[in-house]
A protein has these predicted regions:
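Jelly-roll (double-stranded beta-helix
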Residues: 2-19, 24-45, 53-130
Length: 130
């Protein structure tokens, strides 16, 4: 459920199935280093192909279901951040996901705790901390 205003993009080796139960959302994807917004309206489904960086943006009072297949033991998830101005990749980190609550917070700390990671090497824009 929403709201969700994260700036990271999730990387998954397999497809993800979205079913939007209440309200409308936008799933931001990166397609060849170009941001694309995919609206998913209430009652709609969407199958995200594998290996597409994506960032679901949920407003208040939205409820959705996301189904992912079980990962192989050595399969990694990733979080990627892109410059908000020029879309150059800022930082990426990959990990075998065992505990979503603790592991995501650790990766967020690695990124947001480092001005170097948040600074675009292409245009110099610095992503603000949340």
């Amino acid at each position: 459920g929403g709201p969700n205003e994260r700036k990271d993009y999730h990387y998954d080796e397999s497809e993800e199935f979205f079913y939007q139960v209440e309200g409308d959302i936008v799933v931001k994807i990166m397609d060849n280093d170009t941001p694309v917004d995919i609206p998913i309206r209430e009652g709609e489904v969407f199958l995200l192909p594998p290996r597409v960086p994506h960032s679901p943006q949920r407003g208040s009072n939205t409820v959705g279901l996301v189904i992912e297949r079980k990962r192989a033991e050595d399969e990694k998830d990733g979080l990627i951040w892109y410059c908000e101005k020029c879309h150059h990749k800022l930082y990426e980190e990959y990990f075998c996901l065992d505990n979503i609550e603790t592991q995501l917070q650790t990766v967020f700390h690695h990124f947001y705790g480092s001005t170097e990671h948040r600074t675009c090497t292409q245009c110099g824009t610095v992503m603000a901390q949340p």
